[in-house]
């Protein structure tokens, strides 16, 4: 097995981003999740099927199931003249993932979820996009900090 990914929450968020990106390009949810989790794990003929971590599946399934709601929330926080369609697929996927965790994962403090998605954004996007994602999600967190979890 390679050491490029562990099962830390940060690594699983990154895997969730990869799976969600693949789903946007036509992949099936479970297949995309399995590929994102296992593509760099060395397996032999006798290897067992990799069991997907619940955290990873919860993120991917949750974002997929709440996509329309998340897109509406993102749209309401975009500056005048911007639309969801104008955003890159990478940025939309990162925003959906970050917003979903902030809104629905009670066990993850909002600021932790925000900082974690920014770290993923720095890896898969550029500095400008990471700042944009930080700004939009920070605005969401600051507007209704006690009402964000539902």
Curated annotation (Swiss-Prot):
SUPFAM superfamilies registered for this protein in UniProt: NusB-like
Question: Which molecular function term from Gene Ontology is one that the record holds?
Answer: RNA binding
Does the keyword Transcription regulation feature in the UniProt annotation? yes
Q: Which GO terms describe its biological process?
A: DNA-templated transcription termination; transcription antitermination
Question: Which keywords belong to this entry?
Answer: RNA-binding, Transcription, Transcription antitermination, Transcription regulation
Q: Which cellular component, as a GO term, is one annotated location?
A: cytosol
Has UniProt tagged this entry with the keyword Transcription? yes
Name of one Pfam family that matches:
NusB
Residue ranges annotated as coiled coil are none
Which NCBIfam families does the protein's record reference? Answer: nusB, PRK00202.1-1
Instruction: Summarize the protein's role.
Output: Involved in transcription antitermination. Required for transcription of ribosomal RNA (rRNA) genes. Binds specifically to the boxA antiterminator sequence of the ribosomal RNA (rrn) operons.
Q: Which family does it belong to?
A: Belongs to the NusB family.
HAMAP family under this entry?
NusB (MF_00073)
UniProt-recorded name of the protein? Transcription antitermination protein NusB
Native species = Streptococcus pyogenes serotype M6 (strain ATCC BAA-946 / MGAS10394)
Q: Top-down, what is the taxonomic lineage of the species of origin?
A: Bacteria, Bacillati, Bacillota, Bacilli, Lactobacillales
Give the encoding gene's name: nusB
